[in-house]
Amino acid sequence: LASHAKGWLPASIESSSWLRSSTRRADDLWRKIPGAAETRWFGQDRGRYMDISELAAAIDNSGVRFDYLLFDACFMSSVEALYDLRRAADYIVASPCEVMAHGFPYDTVIPSLFADDGARYDLAAACRNVYEYYNAVDSYKSGCATLTVCDELERLATALHDINAGATKAVVASTLQSYDGMETHQFYDLEEYALALTADDARGQAFVQQMERCFPPEGRFHTAQFFSMYNNRMNDIRYYSGVTTYAPVETYSDDEQQQTYLNEWQQTAWYAATKR
């Protein structure tokens, strides 16, 4: 699936941004920096969007479970979105950050999807193809892709629930790896976030082990940096589990937009499965 995407964020938030697009506030999180290179923010259908939960329901209603889904779209390696899609496919390939406008390099990705004359698919190789293409370009060396094993997502939710149940530390979001260039980040590294919650080594180790089953290391690829059109620069990657999460704080009383995001996040299936 190739499109503009915002991970787990609901269409209602996107629609409101679209409606005010001609008069956006200077502090709108989703405001592209003028003159920034293009990422896959194009092709909108007159401001009409679909929630990932709606996509998952449509696939479920079809009675089809795909072998895999490949998202050539920004921010779709979001654990909240992946969890919604856990019954839609056996595997998912997606990027945790923005995808450059050129998209995935299909001249190399397609052969990986039809390996051995079509007898099998090599999704880890498809992730590697994305990385290798962007790592070799002269500018905007920004290419990240991760493979998800969908049958492991519910056990991952249980592992995070166990961490949340015994969480002893407050997470300082500014210390976490983020995957967007917005002033207030929306997409943080899931593994680093979970480990920041707990001082319990056993729970932390159990979570990391489940992460490796859910997101096999041989299917996690990233360039040294990622580009974001929201700050118009390359951003360092110092920690990469390949999947993002929203990192909540208790309240955003002074920020109506962020409070709305927090409220919406608390309606996700992932939140319901992992809250303490």
Give the role of each language-model region.
Residues A26-D27:
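A generic structural signal for short coil/turn motifs at secondary-structure boundaries
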Residues A2-E14, W30-R276:
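Terminal, contiguous helix-loop blocks that mediate binding/assembly
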Residues S21-T23:
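Glycine-rich, acidic and aromatic/proline-enriched surface loops and short helix-turn segments
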